[in-house]
């Protein structure tokens, strides 16, 4: 069993390295940044994930998928007010973009914190 876990760790590291290489080619690629941020979340590197999510949303506020993950990161770390702020921003952007599914996910998470 230990051998399998080690193999999974190698795959995760390889994935992170591949995503970093792709970002070197196009540092403003929000899709790749988002994917790398999710890998950081999985590995417990919340500061790196937070920076990437915030970079994406500063540059491209309409990249609505990142709001949920950034807010969840803050929520998980006990920063509820910051999580609420990001859920609210995300709901506003999702509504503006007509992203109803994303809006509903954000609203549901927001309501869990505020009601």
Describe each PLM feature range:
Residues 25, 59, 76, 93-97:
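Structural marker of alpha-solenoid helical repeat scaffolds
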